[in-house]
Every structure is written in structure tokens, then in C-alpha cells.
Amino acid sequence: MSIVNELVNRIDETYDVSQIEKEIKLDNIALSDLELLATGGYSPLTGFLGKEDYDSVVETLRLANGSVWSIPITLPVTEKVAESLKAGEEVKLVNNGNIYGVIQIEDIFVPDKEKEALLVYKTTDEAHPGVKKLYERPNVYVGGTIILTKRFENNQFPSYHLDPIETREAFKKRGWKTVVGFQTRNPVHRAHEYIQKSALEIVDGLFLNPLVGETKSDDIPADVRMESYEVLLQNYYPKNRVFLSVFPAAMRYAGPREAIFHALVRKNFGCTHFIVGRDHAGVGDYYGTYEAQEIFTNFTIEELGITPLFFEHSFYCTKCEAMASTKTCPHGKEDHVILSGTKVRELLRNGEIPPSTFSRKEVVEVLIKGLKKEVVTE
């Protein structure tokens, strides 16, 4: 499948903001969204959603023009700030004293957050991290086209922080016609490795694209995860078949809807295929095990523009003495060692070393070292 969609580009570092007086302060989520809107990561979006598109996305998983889009990308402001704004004006977008862009306001509206929570996250339970964040953010949304006027100083992972145009170029340079994307917020354990390598058997390249934006407090820190990916790729993957780059978005924990969103974004980064595993982007027990795969049946491959690859839950089978899934292994549950990022995190935080059936020893060493450092700095 060739990539025909045009990338949005809303970057203009020469744009004059000196005459613009009003400003909106961005939180970390809005800041990372601003960057991804501007670089084309969120193509076809050109800005934060106005009311018509917002309502359409929340209710139908499509923009008002019918294009598939499953997560509302919004710019929340307080009532006080909203009172000072009006449609038709340009306003600076600021974070931590720096001006990063402008928004050309088209719309100011009050969303029904309970409805957004129920339809996007399938729950109004504030124990859900996505719902909690939704309710914590201000209550008025500002919609409009954006311009990014200043690039972020990406000090944490500068060499891995690439725009969609750059990853597309990198794939082209390698001669990859088919590329499978893999989204992760966890260290890669053996079940992930099995799935990635199974997918790699049928495509030219693997795009490992860990999310490094805002995540839950008990998720393993991004710098530790990045080091774990580096040692894994160095020791267990063919160098000419994998590409590592970060995804600077915040985690929404929206399960099925976020699986669609993650696929659409990876299409923009240049992928032709996208891996959807068990409970993709899930949290707790809010979503069914394979709900994130089932949601794809609502859309055609043509309108998605990317082919999802579905994988069953994989495990280590003590009888097969190998990684397997129920599709490839005849043995019972008593012979299966179930692996999960949650389990690996749990073992590590309890000071236990995950067995080699769970994680590669080089990865475990990095995680132990990283978590010790985390404990020291807390």
C-alpha cells in the first residue's frame, strides 16, 4: 500500500507574533499536541478541533467531512480566559514563558465532558487516568488552525525525535516499501518481541515508536525505557530491519479508540501496517481483551490508509519451550507463562528479577539500574 496522504505542515518559525497580545497557556498535553499538529503527525488535522468536528469525533469517530479520526484533540482554557477571547482573533500559545505558536480562533465552546468521557473512554469513573485528566483540565475548548513558531528543545532524546517527514525519508532511504509500526509505553518483553518479529517476517521494516509524552505515574520513566529499547535492538534485532524513534504524544488510555488513533498517526509517520495486540492502550479492566482489535471492523482498510495486524495474547510455553499463542500452541494454561508489562513492572518494583522467559537479561539490567536511580531521586 503506497502512502498517498499529504502531510500537514504548520511550521513557520519566521511568523511574526510581536503584535499579538493575548495568550493561552498550554499544559503538557496541549503542548505535545501542538507539535504533532504542526509536523503532520495528526494529519489531516490543521489545528485544535472546533465544535462541529469535536462533536463528530466524539459521536462517530469521524471528522465532520467523514475522515476517520477517533480521539478529540482539544485546547482547554478556563472560563476566565475564554471570556477574553473571541472567534476571528489570533492568540499566542505559551508554555513555561516561551511562545511556541499561535491559534487562529474559529470556535469557543463548552463541551459535555461527561459525554466525552462516556463515549471516548467508555466510563465516567475518575479512577480511569484518561477520565481523571479530562476532568482536571479546564472546561472551555478553543478550536482553530495553529502555526508552530518555535520548535521545542528536545533535550531528552534529540537523536530519536523525528518528524513524520523525516521518518518517511528514513524508510525510503532503506528501501522499505512496507513498514509495520509498534506502539509501546512499556519496556519490550518477550511477548512483544515475539509479536514484532512475527510481523517483521511479512514486511520490510519495523518502526518501534515508543510514546514518551505524559503517562501514568506508575509507568516506567521514558529515559529508562529508551535505554531498554536500545540494548534490545542492539542485541536481538537485525540492525537493517528496525528503526527507533519517539512518539511525543501524551497517553490517553482510551483503549479501542486510541488503537485507531495510534494507527492513523503511524500512517502519517510512514507505516503501511500497524500492530494491534491484546488490550491495546488499555488500563485496568475498562476494556475487553480484544476490543481494540474489534473496533477496526467499523472501517475499511482504504479509509484507514493503513493495515492493522492483529495478534493474540502470546506467552512462553514450558512444553513447547518457546514463545507461542493459542494459534500455534496446543498445550493447556498450566504450561503457559503469561507475560505483561504490568507484571514486569510489579516484579521490578518489588526488587525481583523477571525470569529470562519474561525479559532479556540486558533489558532487565537496564530496568533495575533505572528504577534504583528513580528510587534515589524520589
UniProtKB/Swiss-Prot annotation:
<dbReference type="InterPro" id="IPR015947">
    <property type="entry name" value="PUA-like_sf"/>
</dbReference>
<dbReference type="GO" id="GO:0000103">
    <property type="term" value="P:sulfate assimilation"/>
</dbReference>
<keyword id="KW-0808">Transferase</keyword>
<dbReference type="Pfam" id="PF01747">
    <property type="entry name" value="ATP-sulfurylase"/>
</dbReference>
<dbReference type="InterPro" id="IPR024951">
    <property type="entry name" value="Sulfurylase_cat_dom"/>
</dbReference>
<keyword id="KW-0548">Nucleotidyltransferase</keyword>
<comment type="similarity">
    <text>Belongs to the sulfate adenylyltransferase family.</text>
</comment>
<dbReference type="InterPro" id="IPR025980">
    <property type="entry name" value="ATP-Sase_PUA-like_dom"/>
</dbReference>
<dbReference type="InterPro" id="IPR002650">
    <property type="entry name" value="Sulphate_adenylyltransferase"/>
</dbReference>
<dbReference type="InterPro" id="IPR020792">
    <property type="entry name" value="SO4_adenylyltransferase_pro"/>
</dbReference>
<dbReference type="InterPro" id="IPR014729">
    <property type="entry name" value="Rossmann-like_a/b/a_fold"/>
</dbReference>
<dbReference type="GO" id="GO:0004781">
    <property type="term" value="F:sulfate adenylyltransferase (ATP) activity"/>
</dbReference>
<dbReference type="GO" id="GO:0070814">
    <property type="term" value="P:hydrogen sulfide biosynthetic process"/>
</dbReference>
<protein>
    <recommendedName>
        <fullName>Sulfate adenylyltransferase</fullName>
        <ecNumber>2.7.7.4</ecNumber>
    </recommendedName>
</protein>
<dbReference type="Pfam" id="PF14306">
    <property type="entry name" value="PUA_2"/>
</dbReference>
<keyword id="KW-0547">Nucleotide-binding</keyword>
<dbReference type="GO" id="GO:0005524">
    <property type="term" value="F:ATP binding"/>
</dbReference>
<keyword id="KW-0067">ATP-binding</keyword>
<comment type="pathway">
    <text>Sulfur metabolism; hydrogen sulfide biosynthesis; sulfite from sulfate: step 1/3.</text>
</comment>
